[in-house]
Amino acid sequence: MHLQPGVPSALNRQILAGELDISPMSSIEYLRNAADLCLLPDLGIASDGPVMSIALVSSVPPTSLDGARVGLTSTSATSWVLAKILLREWWGVSPVFVPEMPGAGGLHGPSDSSPARKNEATDPLVARLLIGDPALRALWKPEPGTWTIDLGQEWTRHTGHCMVYAVWAARRAYAERFPETVAEVTSILTQARDAGLRDAPALARRLAPLENLPASLLERYFSTLRYGFGPRELDGLNAFAGGAVRVGDLPSLPHLAWTSPGAVATAA
């Protein structure tokens, strides 16, 4: 058994290229390639309400973003699709989505983007999607005069479902050929997850001075996320898949499957 470290986008590419047999994957990349993959049971990253680390920060209310330029981070495709679904289906707007790298500049108000100019490439951004630490900081201390919105909370409020951001998956061919190995790895990962959750308060205290954030905030963040994958997460993933189809980021609803000892079982 060999462990391969890597950022999420690299791990996504490697399992799809057959360079990895089992890997965490972003939800949208799993859904786009579900025919060749199987879900590992009871492992994932989800929220059932606030997520605290995915935020839309806007200089205007989200219902006023129609035609406005909205920056979407290039580091999280799942969050990108989530933002599109919420903006189009729940807030009823169709912004101009602008891919950008993390650490970009500030926002401009609606007066800086007149209707005659707001689709030009040089126009300023009116809203931006933040991921990870920047989102955590923005939601902790919102900038005055902005709308700072937790997208996990909005998803659950509008749909009633939890939001699944990442799953653990195995290549289907590998899972069918080596079911015992997949089951063993699943058990190891589950035990590691449980140990990490027990150590979450200590981890929060260690990270607090490095991140310049209160330990209580970090501990709340760790406890807010859900790290399992059961029926509620499956329902949430299916709901997200439906939204992704409707906004054009998924061609069709995939047939989902998960691994079990000795077989690949359909996830109904």
Residue map of PLM features:
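Periplasmic-binding protein-like
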Residues: A46-A55, K141-Y174, L217, Y221, ...
